[in-house]
Amino acid sequence: MAAGPALVLASASPRRLDLLAQVGVTPDRVDPADIDETPLRDETPRRHALRLALEKARVVAARAPGDFVLAADTVVAVGRRILPKAETEADVLYCLKLLSGRNHKVLTGVALIAPDGRAATRLVETKVGFKRLSDAERDGYVASGQWRGKAGGYGVQGLAGGFITDLQGSYPSVVGLPLYETLNLLSGLGYRP
């Protein structure tokens, strides 16, 4: 019996691989998309997350014709302000200053392209409350380095989990991939593990 189309994960995130494994989905290969993630002028956080997820999926689908391609992008926003993926201490300090003592939104866009070219997307929005951070908490978190490469400068599954006062929505989405919605996309477009 011939194998069906492969599932390609268009992400280098080990967290997304771990989340998929939790629900019994193992991509056949990982092929990260390297795209410009700069927000467009006047782009809302919702549109930004969906656009990036779909763009990543399309870039990888062009390299993997006939396969399923799954991509996601997670955006942290305070109001309409999209926070960066923290790469420097200045980035994380900027993010923590905006997040401290406030609620914010974590939006994860998910895109799936089927072997026949059909595409489907989902957006999951989660409201997250952050405690007011003391200087010692902020400095300790910065020193930990756990913020590197994370949207909004934090990962809920690490030390920053202790800063979360409230989470309304999808915990896996805040980590990087909403599992319920992802499984529905996969089954809806005909993926069978």
UniProtKB/Swiss-Prot annotation:
It comes from the Bacteria. It catalyses: dTTP + H2O = dTMP + diphosphate + H(+); UTP + H2O = UMP + diphosphate + H(+). It is found in: Cytoplasm. Its cofactor is a divalent metal cation. Its EC number is 3.6.1.9. One of its GO terms (biological process) is nucleotide metabolic process. The keyword Cell inner membrane does not apply. The record marks R15, T74, Q157 as: Important for substrate specificity. Gene3D superfamilies: 3.90.950.10. The active site is at D73. Keywords: Cytoplasm, Hydrolase, Nucleotide metabolism. The keyword Hydrolase applies. GO terms for molecular function: dTTP diphosphatase activity; UTP diphosphatase activity. Pfam families: Maf (PF02545). PANTHER family: BIFUNCTIONAL DTTP/UTP PYROPHOSPHATASE/METHYLTRANSFERASE PROTEIN-RELATED, BIFUNCTIONAL DTTP_UTP PYROPHOSPHATASE_METHYLTRANSFERASE PROTEIN-RELATED. NCBIfam families: maf. Nucleoside triphosphate pyrophosphatase that hydrolyzes dTTP and UTP. May have a dual role in cell division arrest and in preventing the incorporation of modified nucleotides into cellular nucleic acids. This is dTTP/UTP pyrophosphatase. It comes from Caulobacter vibrioides (strain ATCC 19089 / CIP 103742 / CB 15). The lineage of its organism: Bacteria, Pseudomonadati, Pseudomonadota, Alphaproteobacteria, Caulobacterales.
